[in-house]
Swiss-Prot record:
Pfam families to which the protein is assigned, alphabetical: Oxidored_q4 (PF00507)
Gene3D superfamilies for the chain: NADH:ubiquinone/plastoquinone oxidoreductase, chain 3 (1.20.58.1610)
Chain segments annotated as transmembrane: 11-31, 63-83, 98-118
Catalysed reaction, written as an equation: a quinone + NADH + 5 H(+)(in) = a quinol + NAD(+) + 4 H(+)(out)
Function: NDH-1 shuttles electrons from NADH, via FMN and iron-sulfur (Fe-S) centers, to quinones in the respiratory chain. The immediate electron acceptor for the enzyme in this species is believed to be ubiquinone. Couples the redox reaction to proton translocation (for every two electrons transferred, four hydrogen ions are translocated across the cytoplasmic membrane), and thus conserves the redox energy in a proton gradient.
Protein known as: NADH-quinone oxidoreductase subunit A
């Protein structure tokens, strides 16, 4: 069994310090913080704005597919950058490997465009393929399911009021500003 080195003491001190910091941050708010309960405390809020409407707002899912493709092709760009910084060290073998990699990327990109994965709505893909929906079958058009008519659906609650930004009061959607008449 070897003696404890200064490096071991540093690790032990670090673990003790982190543990103390975690316990401190969890217990001090319990001791010093006020405890109040009520209906307003149970309400969800986003950045201090009073919520409006229900939680069942349909948001467009079109961007998720593009985001996934962005992440995939962004990672490939990272690999290309790593190869470009070490191109002299890897030689012809690395060059050949990267050419195969780039060709695979181009094939994947052509496949993505050919399958219509970047087309915004499935109905456009069905029209391009010449597929007509069957009468009586459920319409599974994801673009129609996730579409919302306007931004007003997001900011107007069911009673037709627009929530105030920070006060919690509700302002009428149709309220007009006082006008001054000149005679």
């Amino acid at each position: 069994m070897s003696a404890i080195t200064p490096y071991d003491w540093a690790i032990i001190a670090f673990v003790i310090g982190v543990t103390f910091l975690c316990v401190f941050m969890l217990t001090v708010p319990l001791l010093l913080g006020g405890k109040s309960w009520g209906r307003a405390k149970q309400e969800q809020f986003e950045s201090g704005v009073v919520s409006a409407g229900g939680a069942r707002i349909r948001l467009s899912a079109k961007f998720y597919l593009v985001a996934i493709f962005f992440v995939v092709f962004d990672l490939e760009a990272l690999y290309l950058y790593a190869w470009a910084t070490s191109v002299r060290e890897v030689g012809w073998m690395g060059f050949t490997t990267m050419v195969i990699f780039v060709v695979d990327l181009l094939i994947a990109l052509i496949y993505v465009f050919a399958t219509g994965a970047l087309t915004w709505s499935p109905s456009d893909r069905r029209k391009a393929a010449g597929i007509k929906p069957k009468i009586g079958s459920p319409n599974m058009n994801i673009a129609e399911i996730t579409r919302f008519n306007s931004i007003e659906e997001l900011v107007i609650d069911p009673t037709g009021h627009i929530p105030a930004q920070s006060s919690g009061r509700m302002k009428s959607k149709t309220s007009t500003a006082p006008s001054s008449k000149q005679e």
